[in-house]
Curated annotation (Swiss-Prot):
Stated role: Part of a complex that catalyzes the formation of methyl-coenzyme M and tetrahydromethanopterin from coenzyme M and methyl-tetrahydromethanopterin. This is an energy-conserving, sodium-ion translocating step.
GO annotation, biological process: methanogenesis, from carbon dioxide; methylation; one-carbon metabolic process
UniProt cross-references to InterPro entries, sorted A to Z: MtrB_MeTrfase (IPR008690)
Protein name per UniProt: Tetrahydromethanopterin S-methyltransferase subunit B
Native organism: Methanosarcina barkeri (strain Fusaro / DSM 804)
Length: 108
């Protein structure tokens, strides 16, 4: 945010954004907020990416194009794998219990 000095001997300045002309004061300091706004925009993009990471269909900030459903497919295949493993373990345990019960049926 810069000021245009209209008449330096009278301390008159103009704000180019609003078009107002005012007297320059020595006791006030004016800072440019552009670097702050750039960082806030960058943090906003990162926050949006964090929220998008919760949805499997939205692309992530640093991912390649065309990989929108990668998280969905990885979750599907991962859960299918663990489901098969747990199902086989449960079936094996059930078969073992049935086998032991059949062995004990002749003894008892």
């Amino acid at each position: 945010m810069s000021m245009i000095r209209i008449a330096p001997e009278l301390n008159l300045v103009m704000d180019p954004e609003t078009g107002t002309i005012t007297q320059e004061r020595k006791d006030s300091i004016q800072y440019s907020m552009e670097p702050v706004f750039e960082r806030v925009d960058k943090l906003d993009a990162i926050a949006d990416d964090l929220v998008n990471s919760l949805s499997p269909s939205n692309p992530l900030l640093n991912s390649w194009p065309g990989r929108e459903n990668t998280s969905y497919m990885a979750g599907f295949y991962g859960n299918t794998f663990y489901g098969v493993i747990i199902g086989l373990a449960f079936s094996g345990l059930l078969a073992l219990v049935i086998y032991i019960a059949s062995l004990m049926r002749g003894v008892v």
